[in-house]
From Swiss-Prot:
This is PKHD-type hydroxylase PHZ_c0292. Residues 78-178 form the Fe2OG dioxygenase domain. Its cofactor is Fe(2+); L-ascorbate. It comes from the Bacteria.
Amino acid sequence: MMLHIPQVLSKAKVAELRALIDAAPWVDGNETSGTQSALAKRNAQLPEGSPAATQAGEAILDALERNPLFVAAALPQVVFPPLFNRYAGGEAFGLHVDNSIRQSRDGRTRIRSDLSATLFLTEPEDYDGGVLVVEDTFGAHEVKLPAGDMILYPASSLHEVTPVTRGARVCSFFWIQSLVREDARRELLFQMDLAIQQLGARIGADAPELVSLTGGYHNLLRMWAEV
């Protein structure tokens, strides 16, 4: 399941984070690449664990905790500390799959990457190219979102970033270990959650039918969750 989550960050918050990270030193993006990814990756990245990356990452994590759409879709158990990349001057990231296990440089965080997330920090009209292309069984999906919006997709997906031919594309990217590792099960729970919310608005949260459906949701989550 791919999901566009709008306005994870306000425009003012995006501007605040951009001022912070733009003033910080950047390094070769391959510092965090696996062997195969390093062959396809050309970009710059904020050093993992740097003061700017840590401060900006904490702001993003705070925003995610308050975002009900993200919580419902991802069912997050652990969110990897957000990283930051920048593409400019023809830089790109060829077709690849993210590593199945991610470990932070300090060794404090080690997760199974169930979901990948890209949070856009540049307005789409400010750069050419830089399209995130995610492949699944239905084909290739092109993603280029407003600053502050985020795309969430299975980490098992083949994906790439096309060359940036004008301007610079700055994003945050990170991975999520979900309480429910299988994408199909997560999607079913997400659809049930949305239906419960919509029905609650129409018939009332205390309607017997809704109480029964909510119980079914939690029993499925109980059956599938890994904690």
